[in-house]
């Protein structure tokens, strides 16, 4: 026999099942990403100290400087992306924890109502009626609160998933600026890696065929679309068939979503009878959700489920800094500091060093035969770097050519 206590028990079991789906234990706050963010910041600061001195001149030195600055910017981007990811995981952990607290409170409340209903059902005549009168509204309140909390968690999780796609897009954009040296073996591109991971490919398992038994219809796997054919079925002459119905007219082809045809033209619609009803089906936007008041904010002992943190990816903190850094990185790579130029500069400098070594050997033979002239002209033969001092400023600024 159905009773109010049975309704409370069913409601409590449903809430308990939802708690199981939310998991147990403390959610991961994402501290590992915060640690990675600080590590990338330290790497960026160390790379800023690796810039060559002012006495390094030449195209190779400029290409090296550009590559060093580009690597520093990449480290900054990775640190900012780790910080964004850590904040997102921390927020998601808070959303899950708050939703659990709400569901536990509702389960505790409905368990108390269950005990009261059990006591009322022992009263003869009106006991079951009083039990129903108490169980129905309390179970309805509990289910409404649980549904609102789960809807809140769904919306906030959807927002985090959308923002995570934005972070992944920035990461892929940064990986496309990595140097590709011609002498190194080819590495798989990022699209090839993604295609190999998703969608997952099932192993090709051969399915043995069925034995060929005379009289049985052919069996093919996988099945082909269409109705199966069963041969040698008896036919009944004169048996009436199904009547042929005329073609049902299709829905009118309108841009956007399809609409139901107007079966009764001229009659007023629901929107005409009740103004404002037509706007009920419109889904709220992110901005409208963020402006909603906090859910359960006025109940003591329950966490406040608010949509104030409902921000788009462009509105998140640190995203503007990531966008600016990515712009600098792309401009630096496009300005000529690319890896191909760095490799060509390296080959040119190798040839220059080889030619200078040959010239140095010839000059060494001349200096041995005429040591006195070499000592007299040593002051004129020396070349100081740019930061050598006053003598360098008098002869003109010359530096170490790379």
UniProtKB/Swiss-Prot annotation:
Which segments show compositional bias classed as Basic and acidic residues?
A: 369-385
Where is the segment annotated Disordered?
A: 345-402
The disruption phenotype is: Inactivation does not abolish EsxA (ESAT-6) secretion, EsxA-specific immunogenicity and enhanced virulence.
Q: Assign the protein's first listed, main location to one coarse class.
A: membrane
Domain of life of the native organism: Bacteria
Q: Where is the composition biased (Low complexity)?
A: 346-365
Which GO BP terms, alphabetically? biological process involved in interaction with host
Provide the protein's localization.
Cell inner membrane
In its UniProt entry, the species of origin is given as Mycobacterium tuberculosis (strain ATCC 25618 / H37Rv)
Q: What is this protein called?
A: ESX-1 secretion-associated protein EspE
What membrane topology is given?
Single-pass membrane protein
Q: Which residues cross the membrane?
A: 136-156
Question: What UniProt keywords are attached to this protein's entry?
Answer: Cell inner membrane, Cell membrane, Membrane, Transmembrane, Transmembrane helix
Q: What do the Gene Ontology cellular component annotations say?
A: plasma membrane
Listed Pfam families: EspA_EspE
